[in-house]
């Protein structure tokens, strides 16, 4: 399992986690139904969801789709680790935006009784990885879930929710289909993902064409996730961030892999085409600003992990205000009341 193991200085941030290298060929990884009472004031329309479905279907049809699975498999394994951290079994679970089954392959039938795998791309479902868990494939949009209230004990989602147009509503639907005391464990790309590529494209396009357009999709800020989860009804929240750095021979190899992952930009306001000279200039800027000692260039993927529980009366709750029997001012006296052998040193 890849884990952070150091620091790497970045051009516009004070630090970023670095991940131990693992040889992966030419790449080196270093690092339905709407819920009742939806509170979303309006439906945003940032992404072309039909284009995203086509991109994912195209990626799943490639002769060697596993060649581009390295990042999604790594994040899927980290989601599975978080599932195993919970000491219970889950009779019925859902993987939302499952792709080719990047989470299921790391789970076992002792932990998951039955696994529903839902995705917008039919080819991804047809070519999903094998698992020992009994599975059911469901062609479904993450924005419209075709499941009843209180259905699942566990919902997981890995690197899919950053493409939904209305994240608050999607989280509300996940909460809706969870059973009481059910848990949601998710991962999505964070705002600093591919900042090297974004910066290089902006600099080159500004110089060559007198301005720039967005070429990388917008991402949610980590400060918003806790609020969105709470507003959706989740409690006992956990939100943390991680970074995975992947080294590529150059910018064009990175962009080829993004296409192979099905992660190309699908925002409505994307610019369809950049001039060849602008692309070559961006590749030169990328190499000049971020090149490693071995000549490769890094790409940073920031990952937000989130965990939220659906309320159940058996869950621990904060004590009521004013119920404490000892004030902070009296904590220093507690040491005098303890037996001599147990006093703090």
Curated annotation (Swiss-Prot):
It is found in: Mitochondrion inner membrane. Coiled coil: none annotated. Keywords: Disease variant, Leigh syndrome, Membrane, Methyltransferase, Mitochondrion, Mitochondrion inner membrane, Oxidoreductase, Primary mitochondrial disease, Transferase, Transit peptide. GO terms for biological process: methylation; mitochondrial respiratory chain complex I assembly. Its EC number is 1.-.-.-, 2.1.1.-. Pfam families: Methyltransf_11 (PF08241). Residues 1-36 form a transit peptide. The keyword Aminoacyl-tRNA synthetase does not apply. CDD domains: AdoMet_MTases (cd02440). Signal peptide: none annotated. GO terms for cellular component: matrix side of mitochondrial inner membrane; mitochondrial inner membrane; mitochondrion. GO terms for molecular function: monooxygenase activity; S-adenosylmethionine-dependent methyltransferase activity. Arginine hydroxylase that mediates hydroxylation of 'Arg-111' of NDUFS7 and is involved in the assembly of mitochondrial NADH:ubiquinone oxidoreductase complex (complex I, MT-ND1) at early stages. May also have methyltransferase activity. It is linked to Mitochondrial complex I deficiency, nuclear type 16: A form of mitochondrial complex I deficiency, the most common biochemical signature of mitochondrial disorders, a group of highly heterogeneous conditions characterized by defective oxidative phosphorylation, which collectively affects 1 in 5-10000 live births. Clinical disorders have variable severity, ranging from lethal neonatal disease to adult-onset neurodegenerative disorders. Belongs to the methyltransferase superfamily. Interacts with NDUFAF8, leading to stabilize NDUFAF5. Interacts with NDUFS7. Interacts with PYURF (via TRM112 domain); the interaction is direct and stabilizes NDUFAF5 protein. This is Arginine-hydroxylase NDUFAF5, mitochondrial. It comes from Homo sapiens (Human). The lineage of its organism: Eukaryota, Metazoa, Chordata, Craniata, Vertebrata. The gene is NDUFAF5.
